[in-house]
Swiss-Prot record:
The gene is LPMO9C. Transmembrane segments: none annotated. Induction: Exclusively expressed on lignocellulosic substrates such as sugarcane straw (SCS) or steam-exploded sugarcane bagasse (SCB). The degenerate binding motif 5'-SYGGRG-3' that binds to creA involved in carbon catabolite repression is present in the promoter. It comes from Emericella nidulans (strain FGSC A4 / ATCC 38163 / CBS 112.46 / NRRL 194 / M139). This is AA9 family lytic polysaccharide monooxygenase C. Glycans are attached at N69, N143. Disulfide bonds join C60-C179. O2 binds at H165, Q174. Its main location: secreted. The lineage of its organism: Eukaryota, Fungi, Dikarya, Ascomycota, Pezizomycotina.
Length: 231
């Protein structure tokens, strides 16, 4: 009995230690303060994932869609590289994605509701006969480029990593995500598309969400959601 309890405790600790969160924006290679420009969410201290793609939590995480007034907005330039820190590191296999949504006014007043989100980044695995290798595996920060033709204004910047280690059963994928607030200048007249809503962009049975990544080894993988708008 004792050895079984020790095994269970160790397994739970290992699972928890693999969880992660995106607490801060990165600009010019330097991390900003945790939850200064990124909306904090209920339970963020536990680094836990969202598992229901039909819930409001899939937008900016738990209770984060409506707490923008507690968050500052970071000035950025179109074409600039912006990132997020990872606490402590990306500990599960899966794709990394980034979305933006234009606020009608101040980002702090914007809840991100409706078909307003467009994808600016995604990565995928290297596929071999031996399995899938993910470029974000173990990352302690992640970076994306703000599209150069993006119109000026305030935006929500949503980072998301989808952990697929348990995705062989419906509801087994884990979504680690945060939303930052940025104000873009120096942009252009681009028309970001396609636009999607969160919740709504994903279905629990999408092939990029419901998938066994271990056996049989997939021959290809496409992340869920719309195509990337590069501007």
């Amino acid at each position: 009995m004792k050895s079984g309890l020790l095994f269970t405790t160790a397994s739970l600790a290992l699972t928890a230690s693999a969880h992660y969160v995106f607490p801060a924006l990165v600009q010019d290679g330097a991390a900003t303060g945790d939850w200064k420009y990124v909306r904090d969410w209920t339970g963020s201290y536990g680094n836990g994932p969202v598992e229901d793609v039909t819930s409001l939590d899939i937008r900016c995480n738990k209770d984060a869609s409506t707490n923008g007034n507690a968050t500052e907005t970071l000035p950025v330039k179109a074409g600039e590289e912006i990132g997020f820190t990872v606490r402590t590191n990306i500990g599960h296999p899966g794709p990394l994605l980034a979305y933006m949504a234009k606020a009608p006014g101040d980002a702090s007043d914007f809840d991100g509701d409706g078909q307003v989100w467009f994808k600016i980044y995604e990565d995928g695995p290297t596929v071999t006969d031996d399995g899938l290798t993910w470029p974000s595996d173990g990352a302690t920060n992640v970076n994306f480029t703000i599209p150069s033709s993006l119109p000026d204004g305030d935006y929500l910047l949503r980072v998301e990593h989808i952990a697929l280690h348990g995705a062989g059963t419906e509801g087994g994928a884990q979504f680690y995500l945060s939303c930052g607030q940025v104000s873009v200048t120096g942009g252009g007249n681009g028309d970001p598309a396609p636009l999607v809503a969160f919740p709504g962009a994903y279905d629990p049975t999408d092939p990029g969400i419901l998938i066994n990544i271990y056996w049989p080894v997939p021959t290809n993988y496409t992340p869920p959601g719309p195509k990337v708008w590069s501007g």
